[in-house]
């Protein structure tokens, strides 16, 4: 993941970081309740991972995307499927959708691409492009 590209998000990150640096204890107290809420949500998601169902259409789309982006081996698909399960569990849904694949693919696949010395396009952009083509094409 990189830095946010939206100005408002960047400003918020900068403000929070500055707030932490000026007074770490107050900052930690301020965010403690939110941290606990997120922690509970993560624990709940971890406990429901086995309930996430991956049907053949999702498996097929993941394989299609991995082939299209040139991901080496099968680890791309396996990583993408694990991430889809985690996303669904965190969002309290039981079946991943094509939109879930669109959200998560760039994070799981961009570092798995073979390098093309003649293509200066970033791997993130290449993955996004292929995912959008394949999902929008259905």
Name these PLM-found stretches.
Residues 63-76, 86-138:
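C-terminal engagement/docking regions of AAA+ P-loop ATPases
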Residues 1-69:
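Phosphate-sensing "switch" segment of ASCE/P-loop ATPases
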């Amino acid at each position: 993941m990189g830095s946010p590209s939206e100005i408002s998000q960047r400003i918020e990150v900068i403000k929070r970081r500055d707030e932490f640096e000026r007074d770490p204890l107050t900052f930690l107290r301020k965010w403690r309740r939110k941290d606990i809420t997120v922690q509970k949500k993560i624990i709940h998601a971890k406990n429901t991972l086995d309930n996430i169902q991956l049907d053949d259409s999702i498996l097929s789309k993941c394989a299609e995307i991995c082939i299209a982006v040139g991901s080496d081996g099968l680890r791309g698909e396996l990583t993408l499927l694990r991430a889809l399960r985690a996303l669904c569990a965190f969002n309290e849904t039981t079946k991943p959708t094509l939109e879930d694949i669109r959200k998560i693919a760039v994070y799981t696949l961009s570092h798995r691409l073979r390098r093309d010395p003649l293509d200066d396009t970033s791997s993130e952009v290449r993955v996004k492009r292929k995912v959008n083509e394949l999902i929008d094409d259905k």
